[in-house]
């Protein structure tokens, strides 16, 4: 979930080659939606070394995996899952968290949902590919997007709550793939890197809310963060903060990204989810790899103006102004 890493562009060992479009098979599966803490509203839940203990049972959901290629593996139109920790998951995809293959199912389902939401918003050619994902990266408790354009991969770590057990960690990383699809190499400076982290958090909120709404939507990665936050409420980060640009910049892209995510969330509250999400994604086509937050705010406001008119643009301006960006 990029707690400490920056965008990694190193060349890494290649996974199996994924076709451009694999198929449209379906299968029943068991997942968290989005995670046990958010679903059950229980901040006392902890990892307990991957134990599938009784308090977690009501957090599981049965879903339908779509766009599978019929191979029996988690390979499909929009997601292509590999692992460094044991066998590949095969049907039936009804694992629980005490089996590492559960995380593979989570990755496939939520990456597919992220792409389907993009298409629902009208974006049919943004990261529209079998997004490669590898679970259990080196046993390290960190996840990240590797943006090597010959072979871009989302990699999910282990330790504490394994990262791919939390849908919002998966969706955050998918957010980086979205931006890299729109603006190759995006995030080369402090500000643009913070925009990347902020959008990743916002995208996690947007997609998890679309498919599995919970009461505290701005709290990102409630489950994964139980392993490294003191509580009483566990959040990796929030999208409803009060940080202001440039006063509250600290020079760390994840922390500074809360300025951007909170501006986007303010716009969402003003315009509604569909209008805000459409404008936010569309605006990113006009970003540069090194754009500043104020410049990105101006581009986003102009996009709102072009899509929805002056009243909506004024509401978007107010959301960015509250964060010092307009």
Residue ranges and their predicted role:
Residues 1-4, 16-170, 177-199, 205-326:
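Zymogen propeptides/activation segments of proteases
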